[in-house]
């Protein structure tokens, strides 16, 4: 999964040209030397198109296909597998006191709605992955509730992606400030969910 635009809390959107400049040579290099599937992490259709031309074969949109209205039709046209993620707000403001009445229901309803939208647009359900969006517009309590209850989201009927690798939640749980030192905590969180069916980890 290759991305050129930071989506960490507080990060600002960069231009399409800059995002393409960052990812295109990397994807081209990898695809020329390996048959490994490459996913592009982007919210923008023009970036996804450039990545596809360079060798990417999947789109991972952290906005859940709400940022660029042209991206969904493009993915449908190219028959690309997709990952749809829940986030609340944009990276620059998503951690400004996020609130939910019921985090499980609200995230589930969003993902269910977006999955149905993807299917209606022509993307087969078996080509869709759902991501609960750990750290995207959620505080520690929200994140822990989602992680502990991730089996709830199997009701969506698609594989689930649990992305916790080196995120700040590991620091808040284990007091590991340097992201480079959070790998053990990341593995521990993922390991506790290994018995769940159709769950992917990043």
Annotate each PLM feature.
Residues 103-187:
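Catalytic alpha/beta core domains of metabolic enzymes, predominantly
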Residues 192-198:
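Conserved small/polar residues in nucleotide/adenosyl-binding loops
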Residues 5-7, 43-45, 62-64, 87-88, ...:
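Active-site beta-loop-alpha junctions enriched in small/polar residues
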Residues 13-38, 78, 150-160:
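Alpha-helix-loop-beta-strand connector modules within alpha/beta enzyme cores
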Residues 1-22, 134:
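Glycine-rich, proline-tolerant flexible connector loops at the mouths of alpha/beta enzymes
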